[in-house]
Amino acid sequence: MDEGGMPLLPDSLVYQIFLSLGPADVLAAGLVCRQWQAVSRDEFLWREQFYRYYQVARDVPRHPAATSWYEEFRRLYDMVPCVEVQTLKEHTDQVLHLSFSHSGYQFASCSKDCTVKIWNNDLTISLLHSADMRPYNWSYTQFSQFNQDDSLLLASGVFLGPHNSSSGEIAVISLDSFALLSRVRNKPYDVFGCWLTETSLISGNLHRIGDVTSCSVLWLNNAFQDVESENVNVVKRLFKIQNLNASTIRTVMVADCSRFDSPDLLLDAGDQAGLPCRVFDLGGDTEEEATDPGLHTSGSGHVKEGLRRVFDSVLDGHGQLSDCALETKVAELLAQGHTKPPECPDADSRNKYLIFTTGCLTYSPHQIGIKQILPHQMTTAGPVLGEGRGSDAFFDALDHVIDVHGHIIGMGLSPDNRYLYVNSRAWPPGSVVADPMQPPPIAEEIDLLVFDLKTMREVKRALRAHRAYTPNDECFFIFLDVSRDFVASGAEDRHGYIWDRHYNICLAKLRHEDVVNSVAFSPQEQELLLTASDDATIKAWRSPRIVRVLQAPHPRPRPFFSWFASHRR
């Protein structure tokens, strides 16, 4: 090799040789001499290594926050939480859900063993508190969420009730004293519930109207139920929404519009022009949105005329409608004169979106409903329950509906609340739902879809690697989570998965012994991920970089400081 003089090989030839090597060999060769070291850090060399190693499409640009191709390669290789560092076995049954506090200092877990456990997130995770919900007639705990200042924990689960129903209940737990502050009925249980403000939460109730028609009512509840006056609300009705074809509202969550202005690091990958638009804006008045003009007119005269035409068609034998189809058609017509149109959005950045799964064709959740929550709706203050009900418009219309043409099994928001990630098991192309109680078969592959809540458009090609095997009637929720750069999800194939949000590539598979139900990134440290499984364990995963830092030997103190430390009181 060169000894400080002229190099024996020109840089261009060394570069061509390095192109044929793998990343590890390039780094090893860079230790030989200064010339090879310089070539081994060449930007064009690492650009080629990056696209080849990670198999990223060449038209996908580098992450906008990246400073070099070498550092970007290192980020995906060295900073993904894929090294198992701890296994928690305190639960005695399937672990269903995980949630972090906003500070990242604590997290909560829910399980089929009917406990909510709260953990200290130190370098070695330890159990802080366990709340047994069986004395409250719960079957199991399903979901939890910390409020914004991490002073309260919302926990929800299946409440057996007097008739062994599938209704649920929400409990609010103080994180200072671990006292149970309040309990709120929640039906169906997979509404889960969520925080709207630091001291108010959203729950649901379901009222049957017919065999396949119902009404979902979403309630705003005060976390503290003790009041000094009967004229002070502890609960207020937020929205009342009609359900057709055995569908119900489930999986509610809140997106904060004021956080949309955070730096946008998510760029569209490739040509998205060919993607079909899945978003239907129900708040607009364009002709394209009205699929059946007869069903979108208002006024009692139009409703009566529509009903007359439906019944005449049935009596004349022209319309071969099933009982379910007839009930749905009549319910749609009757609701037209009793539905409040969406309120015009304003420029107030304090507005929030209520997001939930729903449907219009079958009981299987195949649509995402979005309803704007205005500032005056974010408090229980106002008329006492029972007052102000004079209006005939007792249903609320949705602002937006996203149809995914498949069974939705999970949703999660990006840290800035702008992007909605959706786990969905697709229906066969061109499938038609003839019976609301018999939805189409669902795919074994899970598609991870991405929607921009600022533009209400699908912005990414579907991520696909994880799998599920249960049929429609046994399908259960797979919780996902999103960090600044990564998105993770569980799966029924005994693995958790991590993808890069920008490049749309799978970076890691995290093994369990059974179905992985939930994943959670630390909100303060995306190089820490938790996974929860039916194998009754919670596993903690850290990045190779963090593992090296934690395992590095600490330098021994110098003699003077050693003597000084030993003589301190």
From Swiss-Prot:
Domain F-box: 3-49
Classification via Gene3D superfamilies: 1.20.1280.50, YVTN repeat-like/Quinoprotein amine dehydrogenase
Motif D-box: where in chain: 308-316
Domain of life where this protein originates: Eukaryota
InterPro entries: F-box-like_dom_sf, F-box_dom, FBXW5, WD40/YVTN_repeat-like_dom_sf, WD40_repeat_dom_sf, WD40_rpt
UniProt record, GO biological process: proteasome-mediated ubiquitin-dependent protein catabolic process; protein ubiquitination; regulation of centrosome duplication; regulation of mitotic nuclear division; SCF-dependent proteasomal ubiquitin-dependent protein catabolic process
GO terms, molecular function: protein kinase binding
Pfam families: F-box-like, WD40
One GO CC term on file: cytoplasm
Subcellular location: Cytoplasm
Listed pathway(s): Protein modification; protein ubiquitination
UniProt comment concerning the protein's domains: The F-box domain mediates interaction with components of SCF (SKP1-CUL1-F-box protein) complexes, while WD repeats mediate interaction with components of DCX (DDB1-CUL4-X-box) complexes. The D-box (destruction box) mediate the interaction with APC proteins, and acts as a recognition signal for degradation via the ubiquitin-proteasome pathway.
Protein family (similarity comment): Belongs to the FBXW5 family.
Name of the protein described by the UniProt record: F-box/WD repeat-containing protein 5
